[in-house]
From Swiss-Prot:
Its main location: mitochondrion. Belongs to the bacterial ribosomal protein bL17 family. It is found in: Mitochondrion. One of its GO terms (molecular function) is structural constituent of ribosome. Keywords: Mitochondrion, Ribonucleoprotein, Ribosomal protein. Component of the mitochondrial ribosome (mitoribosome), a dedicated translation machinery responsible for the synthesis of mitochondrial genome-encoded proteins, including at least some of the essential transmembrane subunits of the mitochondrial respiratory chain. The mitoribosomes are attached to the mitochondrial inner membrane and translation products are cotranslationally integrated into the membrane. This is Large ribosomal subunit protein bL17m. GO terms for biological process: mitochondrial translation. NCBIfam families: L17. Pfam families: Ribosomal_L17. Residues 173-200 have a biased composition (Basic and acidic residues). It comes from the Eukaryota. One of its GO terms (cellular component) is mitochondrial large ribosomal subunit.
Amino acid sequence: MTKTLYYRKLGRTSAHRQALLRNLVTSLVKHESIQTTWAKAKEAQRFAEKLITMAKRANPQNNRKGLAEGMVFEKETTLKKVFDVLVPRYNGRRCGYTRLLKLPPRSTDNAPMGVLEFVDGPKDIRFHMTAKTVGICLAQQKALTPITRKNIHKVLLFRKNGKAEFDQLVQKEKESEHARLKEDHEDEKTVKKDWKRGDPIPRPTYI
């Protein structure tokens, strides 16, 4: 009879696995974004979600804060940030405090890699990439795709003061794209070419 595997063992003993996850979550709280293998990131994501949920439900009548202390290292600094920064940030969210994105495989052993981050934070990749996409589309006078509009709604739904920060990033990317387009246009004018964009590629004479 096959056994159901409810979690990844990560090739370690129980104590070593627990210490690894505590270390990953501590680094995640400290830096708000970490890169590791996909399997470790998936397990650390579950650990981090439990930590935030436990911190949100902590009160003097229960032992949730004591349980949260056992999930991280450097308790004084880590838990201070959890309760002072992360819990107020996610008061409006019931779940989904982290996001896991795929990265190219590691060059040395081709291991699947990923980046684990807290959403609505200063290192939110989707927030910055969506703002960059909108800025480029506005500079090139292109319509926003349905996926981009959906991402705008997602990244601004729970983010405090997100609209002002998003508009600032969009304007910055728009100006950067305008400068790039202007530079490309100047290069096309200065370089002498006996062909123009859209002309068919000439075939070699020996064919």
